Amino acid sequence: MLLGPASGAPSPLLASLPLPTRPLQPPLDFKHLLAFHFNGAAPLSLFPNFSTMDPVQKAVISHTFGVPSPLKKKLFISCNICHLRFNSANQAEAHYKGHKHARKLKAVEAAKSKQRPHTQAQDGAVVSPIPTLASGAPGEPQSKVPAAPPLGPPLQPPPTPDPTCREPAHSELLDAASSSSSSSCPPCSPEPGREAPGPEPAAAAVGSSMSGEGRSEKGHLYCPTCKVTVNSASQLQAHNTGAKHRWMMEGQRGAPRRSRGRPVSRGGAGHKAKRVTGGRGGRQGPSPAFHCALCQLQVNSETQLKQHMSSRRHKDRLAGKTPKPSSQHSKLQKHAALAVSILKSKLALQKQLTKTLAARFLPSPLPTAATAICALPGPLALRPAPTAATTLFPAPILGPALFRTPAGAVRPATGPIVLAPY
């Protein structure tokens, strides 16, 4: 038994003594225990006759005991313009060849093309700072002076100096820079980042000129006579050569228009003749073109005026006769005669209908039988005579053949019925 502080620290004596140690067990190797391997061709080592098997058996064995194939990553094909995702390349190719994709692609290209001139105009409006050549010394070399970058397609870049001339005078450089800057962008300001106010009034002037052109075009494509606006010069020309425009022009000149083969005034084809009376309040209108002063009548055309001149009414007035007024008595007589004729026709039709109905419903021997019955005296006058019965019913309605019994039995006789308990 060891006591003292030496028990806490390992003793050299104990360290020198041989102590039995536990042997370490190696890890189990399943390859020595199993007859087949986990890698490579496992079915080949497990089944010796694998190569001579049926293809179906080979597929089943390789699927069951074979090494699992790595999962293939699914490819996603998408269209960023139409925001669609496809399952295969064939679907994507069919979509790219379709009309929907083509329409959207054209719309995107049109939007981009509209944005390009706007951005170019903004780039041209923004002016880059011009290098200060006056601050440099007269003896400064030319290579340190940078050339101004081009400011867009409509602006011309400043002329670059010839590389052969290396030492031009400083005044020539200043003149060239000032001329190039004035020719390229005259309203530019030397401060960087500030836009020139020149393009805005120019755009306003262009807009006003375009609106003025549009108004003038609308004015050119308008017919003030017919109050019609058309869309093109060809339509205006066709309208001017049309019948409606010609009628409106003739109406303005006072000439009669023609409607379905007969001349009609501008007031319309359905207007009736109007009597000319004095204007209200002593105001008189212009003298009509077709007017009969004798009858105080205004018509719409020359043909109507000729018809009026040849009418009986005008001739009577010309001869000094008073016009015959249309009396109410004559109209009543006409209506009464018409009503009488209608009533007569109705009565004749009713008589004819009664005759035809009586002839259809009553047989021909009935009147003779009735006269024979009425001729018999005594209380038996209403008894029908045998001749009348024979004439009314020449043959029996229900003959004896209808009630004749059949030759054989209608139903065969059945045997006796025996009732017995079970």
Curated annotation (Swiss-Prot):
Instruction: Give the Basic residues compositional bias ranges.
Output: 255-277
The UniProt keywords, alphabetically, are: Metal-binding, Nucleus, Repeat, Zinc, Zinc-finger
Note down the stretches annotated as region Disordered.
107-218, 249-287, 303-333
User: Which portions of the chain have biased composition (kind: Pro residues)?
Assistant: 147-162
Q: Where in the cell is it found?
A: Nucleus
Q: Which GO terms describe its molecular function?
A: nucleic acid binding; zinc ion binding
In terms of InterPro entries, this protein maps to: Matrin/U1-like-C_Znf_C2H2, Znf385, Znf_C2H2_sf, Znf_C2H2_type
The protein's matches in Pfam families, at most eight in alphabetical order, are given as: zf-met
Cellular compartments per GO CC = nucleus
Residue stretches of biased makeup (Basic and acidic residues): 164-173
Q: Where are the zinc fingers (Matrin-type)?
A: 77-107, 225-259, 290-320
PANTHER family, alphabetically? DOUBLE-STRANDED RNA-BINDING ZINC FINGER PROTEIN (PTHR23067), ZINC FINGER PROTEIN 385C (PTHR23067:SF6)
Spell out the protein name for this chain.
Zinc finger protein 385C
Q: Which organism is the protein's source?
A: Homo sapiens (Human)
Name of the gene this protein is made from: ZNF385C
